[in-house]
Amino acid sequence: MMKMEVVFVFLMLLGTINCQKLILTGRPFLHHQGIINQVSTVTKVIHHELEVAASADDIWTVYSWPGLAKHLPDLLPGAFEKLEIIGDGGVGTILDMTFVPGEFPHEYKEKFILVDNEHRLKKVQMIEGGYLDLGVTYYMDTIHVVPTGKDSCVIKSSTEYHVKPEFVKIVEPLITTGPLAAMADAISKLVLEHKSKSNSDEIEAAIITV
């Protein structure tokens, strides 16, 4: 009888240890899987496309040019009240932008996340202010320049954002592809008017004279 009691106690102890191990190891797993403390959001994606009678390389040359950031006020006259650039214009560069009165959002920061020359792909993420103050937890612009012929391409722009459910009706009418469309229009116009300009100095001169 004594042996059976000892075995029973041992099994109980073993079970307790295993349960504790499950709790200790299982909780990080649940955190990792997003089951605990998960913030519920709604994902939205909006798109804009512009066909351009210029090569994808010519269009991408401007989009990927590190000097583009400092010339945004020249490319989009009247849009900015203030523009501060932190970085060299490449990946990791942060733009602190304040727009003219009456524009919304009035101020926010964005960061260049990706500049992929092979696939002509650029990603820019809003990291502070703007829609992030209105329940948006993630906001990413993507520009993809896709060739459709030797001297033709399409600029595919999109915005993906994640927003808390209670803010969806507030931000949905505000977030549009307008800024991406304005940039695509400005760059395509620049390239079409100055097709012979292919290096950085020529592009800079062309932008300044827009």
Swiss-Prot record:
Which key words tag this protein in UniProt? Answer: Alkaloid metabolism, Hydrolase, Signal
User: Which residues are catalytic?
Assistant: K122
Cellular component, GO, one term: cytoplasm
Q: What is its EC number?
A: 3.5.99.14
| SUPFAM superfamilies noted in UniProt | Bet v1-like (SSF55961)
Q: TM spans, by residue?
A: none
- Show the catalytic activity: (4-hydroxyphenyl)acetaldehyde + dopamine = (S)-norcoclaurine + H2O
Signal peptide stretch:
1-19
pH-activity dependence text: Optimum pH is 7.0.
Q: In which tissues is it expressed?
A: Expressed most abundantly in the rhizomes and to a lesser extent in petioles, roots, leaves and flower buds.
What mutagenesis or variant effect is reported for K122A?
Loss of activity
Identify a single GO molecular function assigned to this protein.
abscisic acid binding
Q: How does activity depend on temperature?
A: Optimum temperature is 40 degrees Celsius.
Q: Which residues bind dopamine?
A: Y108, K109, E110
In this chain, (4-hydroxyphenyl)acetaldehyde is annotated as bound at D141
Q: Which InterPro entries match?
A: Bet_v_I/MLP (IPR000916), Plant_def-hormone_signal (IPR050279), START-like_dom_sf (IPR023393)
Mention any Pfam family matching this sequence.
Answer: Bet_v_1
Question: What remark does the entry add?
Answer: May be a member of a small family of three to five members.
Subunit composition and interactions: Concentration-dependent dimerization, but mainly monomeric at concentrations around 10 uM.
Annotated function: Involved in the biosynthesis of the common precursor of all benzylisoquinoline alkaloids such as morphine, sanguinarine, codeine or berberine. Condenses dopamine and 4-hydroxyphenylacetaldehyde.
State the similarity comment: Belongs to the BetVI family.
This protein is called what?
A: S-norcoclaurine synthase
Please give the organism.
Answer: Thalictrum flavum subsp. glaucum
Q: What is the lineage of its organism?
A: Eukaryota, Viridiplantae, Streptophyta, Embryophyta, Tracheophyta
